From Swiss-Prot:
EC number, as in UniProt: 2.8.1.6
Subunit architecture: Homodimer.
Catalytic activity: (4R,5S)-dethiobiotin + (sulfur carrier)-SH + 2 reduced [2Fe-2S]-[ferredoxin] + 2 S-adenosyl-L-methionine = (sulfur carrier)-H + biotin + 2 5'-deoxyadenosine + 2 L-methionine + 2 oxidized [2Fe-2S]-[ferredoxin]
Annotated source species: Burkholderia ambifaria (strain MC40-6)
One Gene Ontology term from the biological process aspect of the record: biotin biosynthetic process
Keyword Metal-binding in record: yes
Domain of life, source organism: Bacteria
Pathway: Cofactor biosynthesis; biotin biosynthesis; biotin from 7,8-diaminononanoate: step 2/2
Domain Radical SAM core, first and last residues per copy: 55-282
Cofactor note: Binds 1 [4Fe-4S] cluster. The cluster is coordinated with 3 cysteines and an exchangeable S-adenosyl-L-methionine. Binds 1 [2Fe-2S] cluster. The cluster is coordinated with 3 cysteines and 1 arginine.
Pfam families: BATS (PF06968), Radical_SAM (PF04055)
This protein's name: Biotin synthase
Length: 339
């Protein structure tokens, strides 16, 4: 009987300063993707248990504080002014309304509150309200995250001074596939914003979207980019494309759910101390596949009935699933990785 051998994947030592040799070559990440499913899951769960409580998941709520009218042409996004999705552009929400939503999220079990604005970048006139939102949400005892588009150095520092815990700015996909999805913002623009966030002392939340028509190698390219950031992000959201009517990616064939689970597992292995977040597109997975995601190393999920402008599984269904799996909601402090 022929024995199947798997490739040994040995990342280099973690660099202490940039520029540095890559820790994860794309070929190494592809080798992880191509492991037999059971082997990949076993390895991911081993890594996960080394650094986190395997039965604890952080609940996050995401609020769109400024919806629609975005200048960017991201092919997946209903909020782009380039696409006819029927979404009406709205102004930035009042601070009090945002804080009311944060209180409701906390009452519903969330320990993390994310605020997203459909902008290319915030204007200086927006900053006082944004920093007030951060301070107000933190006073409620919630972990804070914002995603506002590209930032200047001064804006990143203002958010840091307000106490922002995380700033989300996704790479979206690999450098090779990026141009097929977005033309109004370069890959380097995204990397520059991440550098500004890091330099300001804010934790980085950075992931991507899979299922946009990219190849497995291009998915591996995204993970390689994320894992080779120095340091890699503290928070890594993995989104499953929601093919929204009126966007260029409308009608894109759904990704095999097992490939989504594989991506979660590979993210966990390559970024062992990151919080891997099960994000948009979760409603496309049945309960069994969501359970697989937790087994693969996802330890946070977006919770609530709406995720920006796409639907999310209902909270009652989420609670029922947690009960069936023996998973408990965890606060932000418990999400700190073990050494």
């Amino acid at each position: 009987m022929t024995q199947v051998q798997t490739a040994a994947v040995q990342p280099d030592a973690i660099p202490v300063a940039a520029p540095a040799p890559q820790r994860w070559r794309v070929a190494d990440v592809v080798a992880l993707f191509e492991l037999p499913f059971n082997d990949l899951m076993f390895r991911a769960q081993q890594v996960h248990r080394e650094h986190f409580d395997a039965n604890a998941v952080q609940l996050s709520t995401l609020l769109s504080i400024k919806t629609g009218g975005c200048e960017e042409d991201c092919g997946y996004c209903s909020q782009s002014s380039h696409h006819d999705t029927g979404l009406k552009a709205e102004k930035l929400m009042d601070v009090d309304a945002v804080l009311d939503a944060a209180r409701a999220a906390k009452a519903n079990g969330a320990s993390r509150f994310c605020m997203g604005a459909a902008w290319r970048n915030p204007k200086e006139r927006h900053m006082p309200a944004l920093t007030e939102m951060v301070r107000g949400v933190k006073e409620l005892g919630l972990e804070t995250c914002m995603t506002l588009g590209m930032l200047e150095d001064e804006q990143a520092q203002e958010l840091a001074n307000a106490g922002l815990d995380y700033y989300n700015h996704n790479l979206d996909t690999s450098p090779e596939f990026y141009g097929q999805v977005i033309s109004t913002r370069t890959y380097q623009d995204r990397l520059d914003t991440l550098d500004r966030v890091r330099d300001a002392g804010i934790n980085v939340c950075c992931g991507g979207i899979i299922g946009m028509g990219e190849s497995r190698r291009e998915r591996a390219g995204l993970i390689s980019q994320l894992a080779n950031l120095n340091p890699y992000p503290e928070s890594v959201p993995i989104n499953n494309l929601v093919a929204i009517e009126g966007t260029p990616l409308e009608g894109t064939a759904p990704l095999d759910p097992f490939e989504f689970v594989r991506t979660i597992a590979v993210a966990r292995i390559t970024m062992p101390k990151a919080v891997v977040r099960l994000s948009a597109g979760r409603e496309q997975l049945d309960d069994a596949m969501q359970a697989m995601c937790f087994l693969a190393g996802a330890n946070s999920m977006f919770y609530g009935d709406q995720l920006l402008t796409t639907s999310n599984p209902q909270t009652q269904r989420d609670r029922a699933l947690f009960e069936r799996l023996g998973i408990r909601a965890s606060d932000a402090d418990a999400m700190q990785a073990n050494a």
